[in-house]
Amino acid sequence: MIIEAKSAVINREIRNDVKIEVIDGVITSLEAVGTPDRIIDGTLIPGFVDIHCHGGAGHYFGSKNEAEIQKVIDIHRANGTTTMLASLVTEPLDALKEQIKRLLPFVQSGAIAGIHLEGPYLSPHKCGAHDPALLRDPVPSELQELLDVADGAIS
């Protein structure tokens, strides 16, 4: 596919009147030749990377419903986010493990880049929206349990 745009951000510079070739979702040329398949009347920019994302448009990564998790991903994709971590808030350890298990297939498929655990190991004096009653000091065996369940998905 050849995409033509009035301008594009490439290597930290704005270039005018560009044609970019994309094959299988990968940019293969920044100076494509040929008739464009798509013309963008604007500026083409790289996708957004969100490393702290709990959800979007009323949907939440901590949901027990996989369809709702997919809606979060779809909403972000439709608005320019190409890479994201699913952030989870402080919960009891068993609930966190279940949330991680639900998110794991989305990580394995590449739909999300990984899982961000925002708690439960936070200072009760700077816990933001987290329930202070659920915060606790890190325990190596608990951390290992979370890492084992996540199978490399915690980022």
Where are these regions (language model features)?
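Histidine-rich, glycine-flanked metal-binding segment
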Residues: M1-I45
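Divalent metal-dependent hydrolysis catalytic cores, especially in the metallo-beta-lactamase
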Residues: H54, Q70-Q99, A111-S123, A150-S155
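Glycine-rich phosphate-binding loop of ATP-grasp-fold ATP-dependent ligases
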Residues: H125-L135
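Alpha-helical scaffolding segments of alpha/beta enzyme cores, especially the outer helices
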Residues: K71, E98-P105, S141, E145
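Histidine/acidic residue-rich metal-binding segments in metalloenzymes
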Residues: V33-P36, R136-S155
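Short, conserved glycine- and acidic-residue-centered signature motifs
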Residues: G62-N65, L135-V139
